[in-house]
Amino acid sequence: MKDLLNLLKNQGQVEEFDAIRIGLASPEMIRSWSFGEVKKPETINYRTFKPERDGLFCAKIFGPVKDYECLCGKYKRLKHRGVICEKCGVEVALAKVRRERMAHIELASPVAHIWFLKSLPSRIGLLMDMTLRDIERVLYFESYVVIDPGMTTLEKGQLLNDEQYFEALEEFGDDFDARMGAEAVRELLHAIDLEHEIGRLREEIPQTNSETKIKKLSKRLKLMEAFQGSGNLPEWMVLTVLPVLPPDLRPLVPLDGGRFATSDLNDLYRRVINRNNRLKRLLDLSAPDIIVRNEKRMLQEAVDALLDNGRRGRAITGSNKRPLKSLADMIKGKQGRFRQNLLGKRVDYSGRSVITVGPTLRLHQCGLPKKMALELFKPFIFGKLEMRGLATTIKAAKKMVERELPEVWDVLAEVIREHPVLLNRAPTLHRLGIQAFEPVLIEGKAIQLHPLVCAAYNADFDGDQMAVHVPLTLEAQLEARALMMSTNNILSPANGEPIIVPSQDVVLGLYYMTREAINAKGEGRVFADLQEVDRVFRAGEAALHAKIKVRINETVKDRDGSITKNTRIVDTTVGRALLFQVVPAGLPYDVVNQPMKKKAISKLINQCYRVVGLKETVIFADQLMYTGFAYSTISGVSIGVNDFVIPDEKARIIGTATDEVKEIESQYASGLVTQGEKYNKVIDLWSKANDEVSKAMMANLSKEKVIDRNGDEVEQESFNSMYMMADSGARGSAAQIRQLAGMRGLMAKPDGSIIETPITANFREGLSVLQYFISTHGARKGLADTALKTANSGYLTRRLVDVAQDLVVTEIDCGTEQGLLMTPHIEGGDVVEPLGERVLGRVIARDVFKPGTEDVIVPAGTLVDEQWVEFIELNSIDEVIVRSPINCETRYGICAKCYGRDLARGHQVNIGEAVGVIAAQSIGEPGTQLTMRTFHIGGAASRTSAADSVQVKNGGMVRLHNLKQVVRADGNLVAVSRSGELAIADEFGRERERYKLPYGAVISVKEGEKVEAGAIVAKWDPHTHPIVTELKGTVTFVGMEENITIKRQTDELTGLTNIEVMDVKDRPAAGKEIRPAIKMVDANGKDLYLPGTDVPAQYFLPANALVGVADGAQIGVGDVIARIPQETSKTRDITGGLPRVADLFEARRPKEASILAEVSGTIAFGKETKGKRRLVITPTDGSDPYEELIPKWRHLNVFEGEQVNRGEVISDGPSDPHDILRLLGVSALAKYIVNEIQDVYRLQGVKINDKHIETILRQMLRKVEIAESGDSSFIKGDQMELTQVLVENERLAAEDKFISKYTRVLLGITKASLSTESFISAASFQETTRVLTEAAVTGKRDYLRGLKENVVVGRLIPAGTGLAYHSERKRRRDADKPLRVSASEVEAALTEALNSSGN
């Protein structure tokens, strides 16, 4: 019997579940949850503080107020557990049942649920096929709705106002049924026959032609199918029973002074109960219809306010004029249930304190104040004291700890030994914001932090605070030690470079000790070994910077692991020899034989990690830090005002600039230059002067004169403290020194425009009042920007995490052949990022061949490490196809091969790594460093003259890419395509630079030709757009009549006449319809055709075109027959910084986006409409021509008869990512977005690995739009998950049916987060109400695949160590399947047991 009870007890709480389903609650279900009906609006008796019976806090319904004690006090204590008191009707149980027992209110009249009514799209409206306005008029008793027309002429669902209703009554009597209010709506919903309606809609959709109608019908169809499939009934969207929240979740607390603090919900419930009771009474009294109606409307409004206050009409306010917080408000927003209590909870065993520097700690340690440790580790101490027999009970142990007896400290030290603690600094922007350390007990009250981890935490010691957490369980301690220990986080997950890098004083110390000085003490001596150098230095016989020779023994470990030892004599300095003593064996001496600047140290640590491994690197980093601190102390570097040496040339430079500005001012005064030109010239002048001053200053600071050993005067690098700090990268920059010792330069106004008068003084000289005033602008704007930036950056990170949170590595290899083509990132002739850097840590997708041969040198499936990179560079490969997260075919998650290397560890990524979250953090964390401002093109900042030629920087071979060209008579090539590029490759065939060639560029070199550095290889006129002939023949003018379509202009200087085509607006009536053109004919006057087509060679001329040939002239291939002047592009703002990144990730369509060719073919212009031009592209394959209307003010890059390829730019402007995806495919989109985002970050000097951006892109490309449904159940135009469609298509293909066709869709990150399969994740992100209503109506299941869902339901996340837990749990469950019992089996066992016990 006991086992049976246990079995029954365990039936209630289900531990094992794989999905959560949400649905509509039926009235029966609400009643089944309930423990009784709330009939009175009373809460508690204000004298006795006891809950009123049948009220909102009734103990009979909800349970006792005190543990195991009924209300009247008849039954007390545990022995009466489960007894129901006959006097007060209260069950004797735990008081916490008041947190879980619900009640209900029987509504006297049905009430529509506002979520399904008002949350767009209105579900009730969609089902009933009525507009929201109409339904509201029925619900709020303004109109009648016909429910059953009977034999009358009325229609079902027709609305009648009072007059019409009474007219109908007179006419038809009782033949029809029309009502108002929620009961009418409920009746109509109840009457819907879903099966019949679904069948009708499925027939209707294919017969409809209008797009909007199809959209509407398919929406209804979807909703009806959802209702049918989910087991929800439509009438459940109208409530007849209202559930009541358990009282302890809406507490009422007596304050002193007889007042009460109460949850707003109680007020809202009270209103509902009051109105409901009044309505019941009115109905019993059969009051006049109008009064009842009003009461019903008030009840509807009261319930609306309870469910979602303020959704309809004015929000109901409490006594303090604030809107009351309804049930909907409880769950949404930052303070709502999801974000406040489910996704983030406060934890026990934690403390926080100010941090100070701990320069003596090792990397894995942190200093923990004794007081804090004692408090944090209390339970452990109690346990140890009891175990030792020092205390008999916990109480005694507590007393000992409170008195802080000496033995307590001994026990504490023992407890803390090897028990890691977590340190966290808010804001936690990436995973390195929480790391584990071993605590070291210290006196004082501040936590000590190791200086090298400051960079990861972004911490400094100006009053920052940090929180300490204690991992309690053994597993938690294990994870803290194995995964989160600071020594395991040497590399940054964002870019794979070391993040444990010395900074500031340490860098300065190392730089100081590795500098060399001329004629220092001990110069030229030769030493036998490092120990001897050490001895001599300590004895003071040789200076730190002396140049010496020393014999060293070095151990060099190669990449393949082979170790070579050699002994040699090197030229070095004393300091460098001393530094080499701490370098681990395996690194050559050359790593320290240079001045150690910040970059060099970072490179050294990276190299150390790759060559000798983690443990050695950690020890080395610590040693570097101790050495750096020691020597920066010895150096005695400090700055005084005399270190800022003002250059002598400053006055002269400023004088010259002032004179030139005066000259320009006088030109402006006499009207020779315009205001704009003057402004630009002045600003250019001052920028140049500023640069000159700072050059002079740096030259002055960076060199000093000394006497060498032979007594001659020589120059050496300066030991000026200021210069050393900036040069080493410890603190400060040339720009800051310029403000201190040069001139402050140009300042900006608050609106971002530059003020013409610069600040010529510097901080050493001091600013005048006016100068000071000007410079306050910038400083204030900076502060305002920073505040905005932080909030925006945080929001971007949140959206990124949300979209990528469920992306986890779930398998090793998905087996895809797809990949992205990687080439070096070249911009305007400079290699910004070489190929090696881009493919490092990626897996090769297809075999790489040695250039020009069939030999595979890198097989597919290779994970490219540093060795392979060298190999690829060596073999001068310039393109590689690599696996990418975008192409990964894993259904849930991603595979390790497509992701490649785990950047923070340096090996292939492990299964279970949450790569989505890491990507989001890596992109979001540097967000605060990006700027907020948009840049104006114009002003001194970014003005460049228009390029008109290509000048080669490096010598090499010419390569031409997708360039269509014709050869001119003089042998030069003329480009006749838009997207052509010219590249220069070095002797190994690697591309060093790349240039875009515009249409009409004259190229003076051929493919494969060798050119010298500095040669000009192509030229064009940047101010006009030429029309180039592709064949030779005779020119004939068509429709070119003087003063009707063209006008002749004679140039005064040269006397040459030009023909200019008139604008349509300026032509006389006769010329409006004529389209002037130039036609090419052969010697006999026959039409010539464009090569390879049957299109006659005639070139239509747009307005303002200048014709440079005469009628009947003979011209050759590649000659220019006309030029179209390009108006200088108007200065447009380029969005930079954070807003640009957000725009790209949100996939926003830019204003005036560039227009791309939808199909490949020949361009023609059709009939013009008002204000628009009609562009027609006739495809080469003979399919239907494509037409598009383009506004006339858009400047077109194409003209009649020209061939374009799909996706080529027709009209310039910012690119629209959706167009790129549609026309050029996923790879082109990936390339575009990755490059655009990287440009923003690169400008700020932030390195982020491409794969993080690709990972987010994968999540943005999850959805597809069905183009043809085939034999599938999909509806055309539906958005579906790509994986879902692929699975369905596989199934259809297996059954030899027609598969569905689809196009990829790009969603912005917010949209993608809201359209995930998991409703829990979407609801906890944004628009909670909408997500939940939709999920409830469709009866959605959440399979808890992502991270957020599992956090919300309180399980381990399916990533990292949690992945193992979940797979083990599923395995165990499958093994236990046969042992499961059902409810019916339990019932049978129960009857049997009862029978046997009865006998």
Swiss-Prot record:
Q: Which GO terms describe its molecular function?
A: DNA binding; DNA-directed RNA polymerase activity; magnesium ion binding; zinc ion binding
The EC number(s) this enzyme carries: 2.7.7.6
Keyword Metal-binding set for record: yes
> Which residues of the sequence carry a binding annotation for Mg(2+)?
D460, D462, D464
Q: Where does Zn(2+) 1 bind?
A: C70, C72, C85, C88
How cofactor binds (record note)? Binds 1 Mg(2+) ion per subunit. Binds 2 Zn(2+) ions per subunit.
Q: What cystine linkages occur within this chain? A: none
Question: Which Pfam families does the UniProt record give?
Answer: RNA_pol_Rpb1_1 (PF04997), RNA_pol_Rpb1_2 (PF00623), RNA_pol_Rpb1_3 (PF04983), RNA_pol_Rpb1_4 (PF05000), RNA_pol_Rpb1_5 (PF04998)
- Co-factor(s): Mg(2+); Zn(2+)
Give any single GO term for biological process. DNA-templated transcription
Q: Which reaction does it catalyse?
A: RNA(n) + a ribonucleoside 5'-triphosphate = RNA(n+1) + diphosphate
Q: Name one GO cellular component term.
A: DNA-directed RNA polymerase complex
Q: Note the subunit structure.
A: The RNAP catalytic core consists of 2 alpha, 1 beta, 1 beta' and 1 omega subunit. When a sigma factor is associated with the core the holoenzyme is formed, which can initiate transcription.
Cited function? DNA-dependent RNA polymerase catalyzes the transcription of DNA into RNA using the four ribonucleoside triphosphates as substrates.
Q: What is this protein called?
A: DNA-directed RNA polymerase subunit beta'
Origin species, per record, is Pseudomonas entomophila (strain L48)
